[in-house]
Structures are given as C-alpha cells and as structure tokens.
C-alpha cells in the first residue's frame, strides 16, 4: 500500500470513528416513540372529554366574567 493510500485510509478511519462517537449520543427512534407514548398516556389532556372527570373547557362560566368568542 502506498503512502497516499495509507493516509486516505487513516483519514477515513478517523472520520468513521468520529461519526460512531457522535451517533452514541443520538436518541434512537424507538426510545423516542416509547417516551412519547408514556407521556401521552400519563399526562391528562384538558381538551379530551372524560379523561379526568368533567372537562374544564366545557363548564359553564361562573360569576360575572367576560367571555370572548
């Protein structure tokens, strides 16, 4: 193997090592999906009727408050 070929191979090797090191910190898609599913199932949504009792957004207004349509 010539000197120039060796330099190219070593440079490519360093580039691949850097990419591998960088990819270890990236979150996998499956882990991100699982985290999103957990959040959605454990966090109540006030816009979904019946999720946790009466929907706060559909309750009649109390008192002399101002309502904007």
Curated annotation (Swiss-Prot):
Keyword Nucleotide-binding recorded: no
Disulfide bonds: none
Short name of one Pfam family: G-gamma
Cellular location(s): Cell membrane
One GO term (biological process): aggregation involved in sorocarp development
Assembly with partners or alone: G proteins are composed of 3 units, alpha, beta and gamma. Interacts with gpbA, and this requires phlp1.
Record's protein name: Guanine nucleotide-binding protein subunit gamma
Name of encoding gene: gpgA
């Amino acid at each position: 193997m010539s000197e120039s070929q060796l330099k190219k191979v070593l440079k490519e090797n360093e580039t691949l090592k850097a990419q591998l090191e960088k990819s270890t910190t990236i979150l996998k898609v499956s882990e991100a999906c699982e985290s999103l599913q957990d959040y959605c199932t454990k966090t109540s949504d006030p816009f979904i009727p019946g999720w946790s009792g009466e929907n706060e957004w559909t309750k009649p207004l109390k008192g002399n408050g101002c309502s904007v349509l």
